[in-house]
From Swiss-Prot:
Superkingdom of origin: Eukaryota
Extracellular side: 30-697
Keywords per UniProt: Calcium, Cell adhesion, Cell membrane, Glycoprotein, Membrane, Repeat, Signal, Transmembrane, Transmembrane helix
Localization (cell): Cell membrane
Region feature Disordered, mapped onto this chain: 777-806, 831-856, 869-889, 901-950
Protein name as it appears in the record: Protocadherin alpha-3
GO cellular component terms listed in the entry, alphabetical order: plasma membrane
Length: 950
């Protein structure tokens, strides 16, 4: 049950208010319960959780626990219902002896937040101890000469209980000679005596056997008995008598051995031997008293012979007996009450409870680190203890309850600055001189993941040569994390992205632990000049922190691509090219042009052309442009020149070491108005003078007529099919409008999707032809023309297999990817931000594009019916707005068509197609036939260009 105050109601309310206020501030309180000793296991003591204001559900999460310095196992708390119950046998006499007050002091501790409550459980005495006499049989010698009324002192019984349970009454078996006499003095100490009622007659009854019963005041009553064996003597009829029955003495603790405590004195009225007195301790004295005090049997002096400790026992009760030497001997008893005076001889004690280590560095202020209890076995001022802490530390001591301190966080922690603290707690008492004790507390600061991995640089630049071996180590990234343990374990990974059509992880990888970056495949400068990506460093903390670093990997070019020849009508790899030259041409006439490309870049792709000297050292009337590859005459031809010349042109780049290729050109000199008579095979490969000539003009006229007729028939057939075919969605049906822009250099069709399906008469439209935006401003399109578009944009069309007629062979792809060919072919590049028009650098250093440029001839390991688009190598030249490529490839045609118009007064032949002899005459005839028609077309084209530029 709860402790209740029995004082004035007003004072009681005031005191309770103060206690509640103090408990709310320090997080602790005090409860009082009572329980009877010898209670059974499980006996209810009190609803401690309810009385402390704690919910049952929070007892376990808050680590509800009960602590006691000496008797922690006597009481226990049921965490399910919050009831304090008896856990083991409670013996009040064992706990407190004969002390009037007996209590068990408990400390109840709960965490989150840390709170301490003081609980005092009063142990109530029950009548569980029966009175006990010092001896079960007492021998008493009484002289027959004793007068009736004589009193014989007896040792009374003792009861370990207190209060009414220890109040004893005595009874004696009925006898005619004796009666019991019980006297009570001021100290509530009973003196038991046997009183003689009438004279004894030793001759009648030499011995008397009496039974004395002691009855306590408990309910139910308990009794104890002793037997008196009385021997009747005929001598010594006076017993010794003490001056005082009770002696009160004070003694300082730690008194040295031999210190006199008190001298007791007794006298005997007898004479002779019957008056000689011997002093002794009562036979029921405890072993503790016998070990600490000495009684002189002659003079009755009590002195110290052991260690006297106030903290062990605050007082002693010593029973002294005086016995004479008569026959029979007679005795008397007295009591010495010894009070021990305390001195400051005990050092304070510190005990650290509930040490919460390690402490997180982000712990909030006022976080409780530990609970410290102090105690001093001394009393009064000597037992008053104060605590202090090492200065200049981010902690402080807060007094939460009497003799209890909390070690709390006073300022923020930073493990990266200080990872541990060695604290010294000093406890000092109030004695004079004061005593103190210290305790060390090692506080380790636990790491919190508050630092992200950091790179020494935000960006790294790496240079790697192309054609590196797979798995080559190209760089190592390293990040440092200021945290500790797993919070500082850094792992590396790629920040995945797309590089063109491929994932970044197909190019490079990074080792998760070491940060080493590896190239997973050989890098090709011609394909990829700069690889820019990010590496992420992430620690293993919770939550993880990370940072990124940018790596710019520049792929350095190596001279790993030899020049590739692009020549018309090649019979095979290394085959010769035949050209017919009229003898009437003058100096500087361009006979042919050797075209070569190099897939490398820079100096490795800078090509130079050299004409090998003729056989026998003969001088030939031809030369080759060092950087243009144009074969031209050095002088006017005459009749003495041999009709056939075999020219060897060496093409080499400027790499280290340089790579070369050789082209063979067969030049045949013909008379004006004549044509070869031999077959095309003989004219291409034969070198003898027996080859015949045919009239070029006749063949040209026939070819023009045939082509014109075929074109007219095709247009008629196409118109008929368009008119008769039902409008369907797909082949030639209406689709998204396609923008057609015209300029002086030609027309380009494109849509925003940049993939078009071209209708070409019968059959489904082909999606193999890809046209890219030349970055021209859009031209206005009328509704009529929009409806007549032949190009249908189909965004939902499924990808189709490319036409095998439109593929290059493996040997030509490298050439088609080179910077020269890409510029001359007008290849459109697509950048990372979207398709745009970019013109590669002219590696061959040609000042201006040339006319009459042809594609590789069939039979030289190249399929002329091919089509390709590819990124060009490094250092691309950005085209300006409105620019168009000067040439592009028409699939299925052996020539590269030029769409750039040159000035009319150009000195170099800019014909779109290669002529087979008499180029000048043929051009003059064409100009005469077309007349003003050609001039009108040019004016129309210029007008269109002006509109497009606007």
């Amino acid at each position: 049950m709860l402790f209740s105050w029995r004082e004035d109601p007003g004072a009681q309310c005031l005191l309770l208010s103060l206690l509640l206020l103090a408990a709310s501030e320090v997080g602790s309180g005090q409860l009082h319960y009572s329980v009877s000793e010898e209670a059974k296991h499980g006996t209810f003591v009190g609803r401690i959780a309810q009385d402390l204001g704690l919910e049952l559900a929070e007892l376990v999460p808050r680590l509800f626990r009960v602590a006691s310095k000496r008797h922690g196992d006597l009481l226990e708390v049921n965490l399910q219902n919050g009831i304090l119950f008896v856990n083991s046998r409670i013996d009040r006499e064992e706990l407190c002896g004969r002390s009037a007050e007996c209590s068990i002091h408990l400390e109840v501790i709960v965490d989150r937040p840390l709170q301490v409550f003081h609980v005092e459980v009063e142990v109530k005495d029950i009548n569980d101890n029966a009175p006990v006499f010092p001896m079960s049989v007492k021998n008493l010698f009484i002289s027959e000469s004793r007068q009736p009324g004589s009193r014989f002192s007896l040792e009374g019984a003792s009861d370990a209980d207190i209060g009414t349970n220890s109040l004893l009454t005595y009874s004696l078996d009925s006898t005619e000679y004796f009666t019991l006499d019980v006297k009570r003095n001021d100290e509530e100490i009973k003196s038991l005596g046997l009183v003689l009622k009438k004279y004894l007659n030793r001759e009648d009854t030499p011995k008397h056997y009496l039974l004395i019963t002691a009855i306590d005041g408990g309910k139910p009553e308990l009794t104890g008995t002793t037997q008196l064996k009385i021997t009747v003597l005929d001598v010594n009829d006076n017993a010794p008598a003490f001056e005082r029955t009770i002696y009160k003495v004070r003694l300082l603790e730690n008194a040295p051995n031999g210190t006199l405590v008190v001298t007791v004195n007794a006298t005997d009225l007898d004479e002779g031997v019957n008056k000689d007195i011997a002093y002794s301790f009562n036979t029921d004295m405890s072993a503790d008293i016998l070990s600490k005090f000495h009684l002189d049997p002659v003079n009755g002096q009590i002195s110290v012979k052991g260690n006297i400790d106030f903290e062990e026992s605050k007082s002693y009760e010593i029973q002294v007996e005086a016995t004479d030497k008569g026959n029979p001997p007679m005795s008397d008893h007295c009591t010495v009450l010894l009070e021990i005076v305390d001195i400051n001889d005990n050092v304070p004690e510190l005990v650290i409870h509930s040490l919460s280590l390690p402490v997180l560095e982000d712990s909030p202020l006022s976080t409780v680190i530990a609970l410290i209890s102090v105690s001093d076995r001394d009393s009064g001022v000597n037992g008053q203890v104060t605590c202090s802490l090492t200065p200049h530390v981010p902690f402080k001591l807060v007094s939460t309850f009497k003799n209890y301190y909390s070690l709390v966080l006073d300022s923020p922690l930073d493990r990266e600055s200080v990872s541990a603290y060695e604290l010294v707690v000093t406890a000092r008492d109030g004695g004079s001189p004061s005593l103190w004790a210290t305790a060390s507390v090692s506080v380790e600061v636990a790491d919190v993941n508050d630092n992200a991995p950091a790179f020494s640089q935000s960006e790294y630049t790496v240079f790697v040569k192309e054609n590196n071996p797979p798995g080559c180590h190209i760089f190592t990234v390293s990040a440092r994390d200021a945290d500790a343990q797993e919070n500082a374990l850094v792992s590396y990974s790629l920040v995945e992205r797309r590089v063109g059509d491929r994932a970044l992880s197909s190019y490079v990888s990074v080792h998760a632990e070491s940060g080493k970056v590896y190239a997973l495949q050989p890098l090709d400068h011609e394909e990829l000049e700069l690889l820019q990506f990010q590496v992420s460093a992430r620690d293993a903390g919770v939550p993880p922190l990370g940072s990124n670093v940018t790596l710019q990997v520049f792929v350095l070019d190596e001279n790993d691509n030899a020049p590739a020849l692009l020549m018309p009508r090649v019979g095979g790899i290394g085959g010769a090219v035949s050209e017919l030259v009229p003898r009437s041409v003058g100096a500087g006439h361009v006979v042919a042009k050797v075209r070569a490309v190099d897939a490398d870049s820079g100096y490795n792709a800078w090509l130079x052309y050299e004409l090998q000297p003729g056989t026998g050292g003969a001088r030939i009337p031809f030369r080759v442009g060092l950087y243009t590859g144009e074969i031209s005459t050095t002088r006017a031809l005459d009749e003495v020149d041999v009709p056939r010349h075999r020219l060897l042109v060496l093409v080499k780049d400027h790499g280290e070491p340089s790579l070369t290729a050789t082209a063979t050109v067969l030049v045949s000199l013909v008379e004006s108005g004549q044509a070869p008579k031999a077959s095309s095979q003989a004219s291409a490969g034969a070198t003898g003078p027996e080859a015949a000539l045919v009239d070029v003009n006749v063949y040209l006229i026939v070819a023009i007529c045939a082509v014109s007729s075929l074109l007219v028939l095709t247009l008629l057939l196409y118109t008929a099919l368009r008119c008769s075919a039902p409008p369907t969605e797909g082949a030639c049906g209406p689709g998204k409008p396609t923008l057609v822009c015209s300029s002086a250099v030609g027309s380009w069709s494109y849509s925003q999707q940049r993939q078009q399906r071209v209708c070409s008469g019968e059959g489904l439209p082909k999606t193999d032809l890809m046209a890219f935006s030349p970055s021209l401003p859009p031209c206005p399109i009328s509704r009529d023309r929009e409806e007549k578009q032949d190009v249908d944009v189909d965004l939902s069309a499924k990808p189709r297999q490319p036409n095998p007629d439109w593929r290059y062979s493996a040997s030509l792809r490298a050439g088609m990817h080179s910077s020269v060919h890409l510029e001359e072919a007008g290849i459109l590049r697509a950048g990372p931000g979207g398709p745009d028009q970019q013109w590669p650098t002219v590696s061959s250093a040609t000042p201006e594009p040339e006319a009459g440029e042809v594609s590789p001839p069939v039979g030289a390991g190249v399929n002329s019916n091919s089509w390709t688009f590819k990124y060009g190598p490094g250092n691309p030249k950005q085209s300006g707005p409105g620019e168009l490529p000067d040439k592009f490839i028409i699939p299925g045609s052996p020539a590269i068509i030029s769409i750039r118009q040159e000035p009319a007064n150009s000195q170099i032949d800019k014909s779109d197609f290669i002529t087979f002899g008499k180029k000048e005459e043929t051009k003059k005839k064409k100009k005469k036939k077309k007349g003003n028609k050609t001039q009108e077309k040019k004016e129309k084209g210029n007008s269109t260009t002006d509109n497009s530029d606007q």
